[in-house]
Amino acid sequence: MSNELISAVVQAGIVGAGGAGFPTHVKLNAKADTVIINGAECEPLLRVDQQLMALKAEKMLTALDWIVEHVGAQRGVVALKSHYHNAVDALNAALPNHPKLAVHEMGAFYPAGDEQVIVCEVTGRVVPEGGIPIQVGVVVTNVETVLNLYDAVTAQTPVTQKYVTLTGAVHTPKTVLVPLGITVREALELAGGPTVDKYSIINGGPMMGRLVSPDSYITKTTKGLIVLPEGHSLLNSLNKPLDRIMRDAAIACMQCSLCIEVCPRANLGHRLAPHKLMRMAAYGSLCDEKDTPMNAYLCCGCRLCEYACVMNLQPWKLNGNLKGILGKNGIRNNLKNAPEAPHPFRELKRYPVHKLIHQLDLDVYDVPAPLDETPYVAKKVTLPLRQHVGAPAQPCVELGDTVEEGALVACIPEKALSANIHASISGTVTEVTGDYIVIQA
């Protein structure tokens, strides 16, 4: 099965379906003792994984068995929140057929789905600073990714569609299955469109998602689209300029350190102290010789620091800026400490999701988004060549070519970290550039 599995994953163009889009065939080229399916879906409002686990538990566990065998693991674990009752029941009902697998239930806290947090929750191990789970013998993958793997192995089905939650200020919140490459605007129409005239759209969750144009495209990593009305507090936060953040840090930061109390990286034992980086940025203070701008590399961008701050400051955005400056100057992260254990009070510092939803002013949008798998027939798709971490895929079709849905249209460049891309509809190739391929039905 091992060679067959990797070959199927490569051919199908499978990447991480919920995060940065790391090519799965590379991630699975490893040896580990534990494989974790991350079913936490910790971002508020997103409803994809919890429904897929409830409806496709047996397929997912079968694929997890294959991955466990491939990496030589002793066990596989599905980690999810205990209040996903339908998913928990479905998984437990299927477990007797899978003796190497288990379910790990977690509380409703944020960010339970951060891969370093979930490794600690399931195994008690701490991933080193700037590290990845395989360094402690763990492979972490995503619910939809594993289901894509099942389809690739059993039916040679490539990744051409994506499950996406459509929510926020839309007429009918729902979770849909849509072809890759349709526009965000087109996808939102499946939920009845926005309920307001002036709005912004977040691609991803409200905490770690990014603002996108209605004319941007659905890709392999799109998990949710959240519509928010103009003037919403979350949009104001995302749009706050860096110069104002720096000014506010100098004026308002009182070094209370509430940000470090909730920081998931600090609570894993990593040397990240958001309040000290705020002090450094605001005053150029290096009074603690152990702190350098390099500490910003340890920030995962979860944004909890902002919502713990009584002054509404944004250490996460400052950290992101520092990382950008360091990267542009060729300065790499040299912080690689490996804590033996997390903070002793880590479990007491978990941040409740219901509290976070209220702080985000999203209570009115915290509603079900039932899964609707009705096929959507698109007339045109634009397939970005970089839907994953690494090098963009290389077009292997030409202008005027006729392609069938599922046909390979962009290939992995030789010896590159990349992923194949396939036609999500049948039609004619009407445009090929270095950035995307357009197919018209």
Residue ranges and their predicted role:
Residues 37-49, 170:
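Gly-rich Lys/Arg/Thr-decorated short loops/hinges at beta-loop-alpha junctions or inter-strand turns
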Residues 54-70:
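Histidine-anchored nucleotide/phosphate-binding helix
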Residues 74-184, 190-197, 205-206:
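Hydrophobic alpha-helical positions that pack around
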Residues 125-128, 142, 332-375, 437-438:
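Extended boundary segments
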Residues 228-250, 258-260, 265-342, 378:
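Ferredoxin-type iron-sulfur electron-transfer modules in oxidoreductases and energy-metabolism complexes
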Residues 233-237, 411-423:
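Short, Lys/Arg- and Gly-enriched loop/turn segments at beta-strand edges
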Residues 261, 398-411:
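Short, well-structured beta-strand-loop connectors
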Residues 350-355, 364, 369, 387-391, ...:
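Generic structural motif
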